[in-house]
Protein backbone atom coordinates (compact mmCIF):
# COMPACT_ATOMS: atom_id res chain seq x y z
CA UNK A 1 0.00 0.00 0.00
CA UNK A 2 1.37 3.43 -0.96
CA UNK A 3 1.87 5.90 1.93
CA UNK A 4 0.58 9.45 2.16
CA UNK A 5 2.72 12.55 1.75
CA UNK A 6 3.76 14.25 4.99
CA UNK A 7 3.02 17.72 3.57
CA UNK A 8 0.00 17.51 1.23
CA UNK A 9 -1.49 14.26 2.52
CA UNK A 10 -1.92 12.71 -0.94
CA UNK A 11 -0.76 9.25 -1.96
CA UNK A 12 2.92 9.02 -2.80
CA UNK A 13 3.76 6.65 -5.65
CA UNK A 14 7.19 5.00 -5.89
CA UNK A 15 8.31 7.08 -8.87
CA UNK A 16 8.01 10.37 -6.91
CA UNK A 17 8.61 9.17 -3.36
CA UNK A 18 11.23 10.67 -1.05
CA UNK A 19 11.86 8.81 2.21
CA UNK A 20 13.48 11.19 4.69
CA UNK A 21 13.13 12.32 8.33
CA UNK A 22 11.05 9.19 9.09
CA UNK A 23 8.36 10.42 6.65
CA UNK A 24 7.35 10.09 3.00
CA UNK A 25 7.27 13.10 0.69
CA UNK A 26 6.55 14.00 -2.88
CA UNK A 27 9.64 15.34 -4.60
CA UNK A 28 7.83 18.66 -5.12
CA UNK A 29 6.62 18.75 -1.51
CA UNK A 30 10.08 18.18 -0.05
CA UNK A 31 11.06 21.86 0.27
CA UNK A 32 12.29 24.28 2.91
CA UNK A 33 9.79 25.25 5.59
CA UNK A 34 10.79 28.92 5.32
CA UNK A 35 11.63 29.77 1.70
CA UNK A 36 9.87 26.86 -0.03
CA UNK A 37 13.02 25.99 -1.99
CA UNK A 38 12.91 22.43 -3.30
CA UNK A 39 15.44 20.26 -1.52
CA UNK A 40 17.04 16.89 -2.15
CA UNK A 41 18.94 14.34 -0.08
CA UNK A 42 22.21 16.24 -0.45
CA UNK A 43 21.33 19.80 0.55
CA UNK A 44 18.62 19.46 3.18
CA UNK A 45 19.01 19.87 6.95
CA UNK A 46 16.50 18.44 9.36
CA UNK A 47 15.26 20.13 12.50
CA UNK A 48 12.42 18.63 14.55
CA UNK A 49 11.73 16.30 11.59
CA UNK A 50 11.17 19.19 9.17
CA UNK A 51 13.37 20.01 6.15
CA UNK A 52 15.27 23.32 5.95
CA UNK A 53 17.80 24.79 3.57
CA UNK A 54 21.25 25.80 4.75
CA UNK A 55 20.35 29.50 4.95
CA UNK A 56 17.20 29.10 7.02
CA UNK A 57 18.30 26.27 9.26
CA UNK A 58 17.47 27.24 12.87
CA UNK A 59 20.62 28.07 14.78
CA UNK A 60 20.97 27.81 18.53
CA UNK A 61 21.86 31.12 20.09
CA UNK A 62 23.66 31.58 23.38
CA UNK A 63 22.92 34.37 25.80
CA UNK A 64 25.94 36.35 26.89
CA UNK A 65 26.25 36.64 30.66
CA UNK A 66 28.11 39.57 32.12
CA UNK A 67 31.04 38.82 34.42
CA UNK A 68 29.49 40.39 37.47
CA UNK A 69 31.03 39.80 40.91
CA UNK A 70 28.18 37.45 41.75
CA UNK A 71 28.72 35.38 38.61
CA UNK A 72 32.45 35.26 39.22
CA UNK A 73 31.83 34.08 42.78
CA UNK A 74 29.49 31.34 41.53
CA UNK A 75 32.04 30.28 38.93
CA UNK A 76 34.81 30.06 41.52
CA UNK A 77 32.55 28.14 43.90
CA UNK A 78 31.67 25.64 41.16
CA UNK A 79 35.34 25.07 40.41
CA UNK A 80 36.09 24.51 44.10
CA UNK A 81 33.22 22.04 44.40
CA UNK A 82 34.47 20.15 41.37
CA UNK A 83 37.98 20.02 42.83
CA UNK A 84 36.70 18.86 46.23
CA UNK A 85 34.58 16.15 44.61
CA UNK A 86 37.54 15.00 42.53
CA UNK A 87 39.75 14.69 45.61
CA UNK A 88 36.99 12.88 47.47
CA UNK A 89 36.61 10.33 44.67
CA UNK A 90 40.37 9.97 44.43
CA UNK A 91 40.77 9.27 48.16
CA UNK A 92 37.82 6.86 48.10
CA UNK A 93 39.29 4.79 45.27
CA UNK A 94 42.88 5.12 46.38
CA UNK A 95 43.08 1.82 48.25
CA UNK A 96 41.06 -0.25 45.81
CA UNK A 97 43.79 -0.78 43.22
CA UNK A 98 46.53 -2.37 45.36
CA UNK A 99 47.95 -1.92 48.82
CA UNK A 100 51.64 -1.73 49.65
CA UNK A 101 52.68 -4.39 52.19
CA UNK A 102 55.52 -3.57 54.56
CA UNK A 103 58.62 -5.71 54.01
CA UNK A 104 58.87 -7.10 57.56
CA UNK A 105 61.37 -9.80 58.65
CA UNK A 106 58.50 -12.28 58.99
CA UNK A 107 57.41 -11.71 55.38
CA UNK A 108 61.02 -12.01 54.23
CA UNK A 109 61.32 -15.36 56.03
CA UNK A 110 58.06 -16.60 54.47
CA UNK A 111 59.21 -15.50 51.02
CA UNK A 112 62.56 -17.24 51.48
CA UNK A 113 60.81 -20.42 52.65
CA UNK A 114 58.55 -20.39 49.61
CA UNK A 115 61.56 -19.97 47.35
CA UNK A 116 63.26 -22.93 49.05
CA UNK A 117 60.12 -25.08 48.66
CA UNK A 118 59.89 -24.18 44.98
CA UNK A 119 63.56 -25.06 44.53
CA UNK A 120 63.05 -28.39 46.33
CA UNK A 121 60.07 -29.28 44.14
CA UNK A 122 62.05 -28.37 41.03
CA UNK A 123 64.94 -30.66 42.00
CA UNK A 124 62.50 -33.42 42.95
CA UNK A 125 60.85 -33.31 39.53
CA UNK A 126 64.28 -33.16 37.89
CA UNK A 127 65.44 -36.27 39.74
CA UNK A 128 62.27 -38.17 38.83
CA UNK A 129 62.65 -37.28 35.16
CA UNK A 130 66.37 -38.17 35.21
CA UNK A 131 65.94 -41.57 36.86
CA UNK A 132 62.93 -42.50 34.75
CA UNK A 133 59.67 -44.27 35.71
CA UNK A 134 61.09 -47.84 35.51
CA UNK A 135 62.16 -48.09 39.15
CA UNK A 136 65.72 -46.91 38.56
CA UNK A 137 65.64 -44.80 41.70
CA UNK A 138 66.45 -47.71 44.01
CA UNK A 139 69.24 -48.99 41.78
CA UNK A 140 70.99 -45.61 41.46
CA UNK A 141 72.94 -45.68 44.82
CA UNK A 142 74.06 -49.27 44.23
CA UNK A 143 75.33 -48.43 40.75
CA UNK A 144 77.22 -45.43 42.11
CA UNK A 145 78.72 -47.55 44.90
CA UNK A 146 79.88 -50.05 42.29
CA UNK A 147 81.51 -47.28 40.30
CA UNK A 148 83.17 -45.88 43.44
CA UNK A 149 84.41 -49.33 44.43
CA UNK A 150 85.87 -49.95 41.01
CA UNK A 151 87.58 -46.54 41.09
CA UNK A 152 89.08 -47.34 44.52
CA UNK A 153 90.30 -50.76 43.44
CA UNK A 154 91.89 -49.60 40.18
CA UNK A 155 94.59 -47.35 41.81
CA UNK A 156 95.59 -50.20 44.14
CA UNK A 157 96.17 -52.53 41.25
CA UNK A 158 98.20 -49.88 39.44
CA UNK A 159 100.33 -48.96 42.46
CA UNK A 160 101.30 -52.48 43.60
CA UNK A 161 101.08 -54.84 40.65
CA UNK A 162 104.29 -56.71 41.64
CA UNK A 163 102.96 -57.65 45.13
CA UNK A 164 100.10 -59.76 43.76
CA UNK A 165 101.39 -63.16 42.59
CA UNK A 166 99.24 -65.19 40.23
CA UNK A 167 99.50 -68.37 42.29
CA UNK A 168 98.20 -67.24 45.71
CA UNK A 169 96.31 -63.92 45.75
CA UNK A 170 94.70 -64.69 49.12
CA UNK A 171 98.02 -64.74 51.05
CA UNK A 172 98.87 -61.19 49.93
CA UNK A 173 95.77 -59.78 51.64
CA UNK A 174 97.60 -58.78 54.91
CA UNK A 175 99.97 -56.57 52.83
CA UNK A 176 97.03 -54.72 51.26
CA UNK A 177 95.09 -54.44 54.51
CA UNK A 178 96.77 -51.18 55.78
CA UNK A 179 96.05 -49.47 52.46
CA UNK A 180 92.45 -50.62 51.99
CA UNK A 181 91.52 -51.97 55.38
CA UNK A 182 87.78 -51.94 54.83
CA UNK A 183 87.84 -53.99 51.61
CA UNK A 184 88.25 -57.34 53.34
CA UNK A 185 88.63 -60.47 51.23
CA UNK A 186 85.59 -59.85 49.03
CA UNK A 187 86.04 -59.63 45.30
CA UNK A 188 82.75 -57.81 44.58
CA UNK A 189 83.41 -54.05 44.39
CA UNK A 190 80.06 -52.85 45.77
CA UNK A 191 80.12 -54.68 49.13
CA UNK A 192 83.49 -53.42 50.47
CA UNK A 193 82.60 -49.79 49.76
CA UNK A 194 79.34 -50.07 51.68
CA UNK A 195 81.21 -51.62 54.63
CA UNK A 196 83.77 -48.83 54.58
CA UNK A 197 81.17 -46.05 54.58
CA UNK A 198 78.79 -47.52 57.13
CA UNK A 199 81.38 -48.44 59.73
CA UNK A 200 82.00 -44.96 61.27
CA UNK A 201 78.29 -44.20 61.62
CA UNK A 202 77.68 -46.07 64.81
CA UNK A 203 73.91 -46.27 64.18
CA UNK A 204 71.35 -44.67 61.90
CA UNK A 205 71.39 -44.26 58.14
CA UNK A 206 74.03 -42.39 56.16
CA UNK A 207 73.30 -40.11 53.23
CA UNK A 208 75.41 -38.07 50.84
CA UNK A 209 74.44 -34.55 49.72
CA UNK A 210 73.96 -34.16 45.97
CA UNK A 211 73.23 -30.39 46.06
CA UNK A 212 74.23 -27.37 48.13
CA UNK A 213 71.59 -26.26 50.63
CA UNK A 214 71.39 -23.17 52.86
CA UNK A 215 69.25 -23.37 55.99
CA UNK A 216 66.07 -21.32 55.70
CA UNK A 217 65.14 -21.61 59.40
CA UNK A 218 66.77 -22.14 62.78
CA UNK A 219 65.86 -25.85 62.96
CA UNK A 220 67.48 -26.63 59.59
CA UNK A 221 71.12 -27.36 58.69
CA UNK A 222 73.27 -26.17 55.81
CA UNK A 223 75.49 -28.49 53.79
CA UNK A 224 77.46 -28.65 50.55
CA UNK A 225 77.51 -31.05 47.65
CA UNK A 226 79.38 -34.20 48.71
CA UNK A 227 78.89 -33.81 52.51
CA UNK A 228 77.99 -36.95 54.48
CA UNK A 229 74.85 -36.87 56.63
CA UNK A 230 74.82 -39.40 59.51
CA UNK A 231 72.18 -40.59 61.99
CA UNK A 232 69.44 -39.75 59.49
CA UNK A 233 65.80 -40.19 60.53
CA UNK A 234 62.88 -39.89 58.12
CA UNK A 235 60.31 -37.27 59.22
CA UNK A 236 57.96 -37.36 56.21
CA UNK A 237 58.17 -37.68 52.44
CA UNK A 238 59.92 -34.34 52.03
CA UNK A 239 62.09 -33.84 55.15
CA UNK A 240 64.71 -35.74 57.21
CA UNK A 241 66.58 -35.16 60.46
CA UNK A 242 70.31 -35.80 60.68
CA UNK A 243 73.83 -34.55 61.45
CA UNK A 244 76.30 -33.10 58.95
CA UNK A 245 79.51 -35.04 59.54
CA UNK A 246 81.75 -32.20 58.29
CA UNK A 247 80.35 -29.44 60.53
CA UNK A 248 78.68 -31.42 63.31
CA UNK A 249 75.42 -29.44 62.93
CA UNK A 250 72.18 -31.35 63.59
CA UNK A 251 68.76 -30.40 62.22
CA UNK A 252 66.22 -30.83 59.46
CA UNK A 253 67.17 -31.17 55.79
CA UNK A 254 65.22 -31.72 52.52
CA UNK A 255 65.00 -35.37 51.49
CA UNK A 256 65.53 -34.80 47.77
CA UNK A 257 68.85 -33.01 48.34
CA UNK A 258 70.55 -36.21 49.57
CA UNK A 259 70.87 -39.85 48.52
CA UNK A 260 71.48 -43.00 50.51
CA UNK A 261 74.99 -44.48 50.63
Swiss-Prot record:
**N6-methyllysine: residues carrying this PTM:** 75
Which residues are annotated as modified residue N6-acetyllysine in the UniProt record? Answer: 42
Q: Name one Pfam family in it.
A: Nebulin
Domain LIM zinc-binding stretches? 5-56
Q: Which residues carry the post-translational modification N-acetylmethionine, per the record?
A: 1
Q: In which domain of life is the source organism classified? A: Eukaryota
Gene Ontology cellular-component annotations: cortical actin cytoskeleton; cytoplasm; focal adhesion; postsynapse
* Official protein name in the record: LIM and SH3 domain protein 1
The species this protein was found in:
Homo sapiens
Amino acid sequence: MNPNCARCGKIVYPTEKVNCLDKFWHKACFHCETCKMTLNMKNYKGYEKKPYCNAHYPKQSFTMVADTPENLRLKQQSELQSQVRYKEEFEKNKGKGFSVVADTPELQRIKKTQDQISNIKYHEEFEKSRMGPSGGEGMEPERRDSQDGSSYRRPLEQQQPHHIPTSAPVYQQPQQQPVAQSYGGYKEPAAPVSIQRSAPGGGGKRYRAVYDYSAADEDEVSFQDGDTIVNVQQIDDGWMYGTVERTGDTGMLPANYVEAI
